[in-house]
Amino acid sequence: LQRLNRDLDKKIQQLNSLFDIGKEFGVLFEEEKIIKLLSFSLMGQLGVKNYAIFLKENNSLVLKASRIPYLEQSLELLQNLIYVKNPGYVSSFRNKNLRKCIKALKGLNVEIIIPMMFQNETKGILLLSNRLNNEPYSISDIEYASSIANIAMLSIENARLFRETLEKHKLEEEIQIAREIQQGLLPKSLPEIKNYDIFAINISSKQVGGDYFEVMQMNGEEYIIAIADVSGKGIPASLLM
């Protein structure tokens, strides 16, 4: 009964800490700070001594933080971890495709593999080595670490989307300025030419385009009419124009 009570108290404590950690992750929009908070949470809540954090970039695992000695020497072997979908003890993985990877992890004294999931896809990997008190990780500890890792991954993805939104908004503002400049280069009025009616208007299918026109009086009754149309649309065409 005492053991059950201790386990229950531990679960309640972990749930409360997950709630608090989730709020902290929710206000961070920089990948470096999110990874740092994840590291501190693992060390503070589980007493993790050595760990490594990988994130998926261009279908490869990129090491973002590590306290595991000599890990860098095995980075190529660890790329297959990108296919791991469930957390577990290193010794429990039996997949043939992970054989060399698991052997390398055992040599590095890594005990736990935790995929960092987002929308049912492995977006990162968390490796846990020994703890400060050298106690083994329980199933509850693995579940807790997995929860923290997934919260961190959600925060990282939200931060990425936030950055993309800001960049898109900035680009739209710059394109609008470019449109105003481009429209300003077009003649506001056309000269009256005897025996000719000339009308011109430029309505781009996008914010900027590759069309241009001009009517210039040379001398007396001589005029030059210029009409240009760059192949393509949008920004590439406008840059050429």
List each model region and its residues.
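Acidic/proline- and glycine-rich, intrinsically disordered low-complexity segments
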Residues: 66-108
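Regulatory loop-to-helix N-cap segments in sensory/regulatory domains
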Residues: 126-148, 233
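Signal-transmission/dimerization alpha-helices at domain junctions
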Residues: 1, 119-125, 144-167
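Signal-transmission linkers at sensory-effector interfaces
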Residues: 1-25
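GAF sensory/regulatory domain recognition
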Residues: 40, 50-79, 220, 230
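A short, aliphatic-rich beta-strand micro-motif
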Residues: 109-118, 124
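Amphipathic alpha-helical coiled-coil segments that mediate homodimerization
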Residues: 17-25, 30-49, 53, 181, ...
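… and, occasionally, acidic/histidine-rich disordered N-termini of signaling adaptors
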Residues: 31-32, 166-241
